[in-house]
Amino acid sequence: LGFYGLCYWYTWQVSILGLGPLWMSPNGAMRRKAADALANGGIFAFGLSEKEHGADIYSTSMALAPRGDAFVANGSKYYIGNGNEAAIVSVFGKAADSGEYVFFAADPKRAGYRLVKNVVASQSYVAEFALEEYPVAADEVLARGREAWDASLNTVNVGKYNLGWASIGIC
């Protein structure tokens, strides 16, 4: 894909990041949903960075308020490739009551997921998006606590390395 230009390769690269928390998740139903989406040509997104503090995961302001055995998410993410068309967006946040880290699956087509804008002037779509009273069902939680923290770092470790090659013009 990089042969045709970096913008074509970018969609694939970001999909690798979006799949990281899904592949590492103990949630088998979400892993199967991701596999089905892949088989049908779906792309994925990795909702980690925020406008105010980049990818400083200690400072994430995506808040998940408990609602029974589920959550309601509020917050925004910035510079998220494929954030407009992803089959699944893996989103990192914190439980509002405990501060526990949570990775969950979001759907850009569902109510409460608002695309703010494309933040780049290219054919790639790099989103700023906001979750506003976005319901997160218990079966959409990918990881909690240490597992969520580890999934964020492991995904970056595995998936971001390709961006270095692009930045020096190899792709």
Description of each model-found segment:
Residues 40-48:
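A short, Trp-centered hydrophobic/proline-enriched beta-strand micro-motif
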Residues 160-171:
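Extended amphipathic alpha-helical segments enriched in small hydrophobics
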Residues 52-55, 79-82, 94, 118-126:
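Short Gly/Pro-enriched turn/cap motifs at secondary-structure boundaries
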Residues 111-135:
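Flexible, small-/acidic-enriched active-site or ligand-binding loops
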Residues 1-41, 81-85:
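Internal helix-loop-helix
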Residues 70, 74-114:
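A short core secondary-structure module
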Residues 128-160:
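A glycine-rich, basic-preceded beta-loop-alpha segment at the flavin cofactor/substrate interface
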Residues 62-65:
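A structural signal for short hydrophobic beta-strand segments in well-ordered beta-sheet cores
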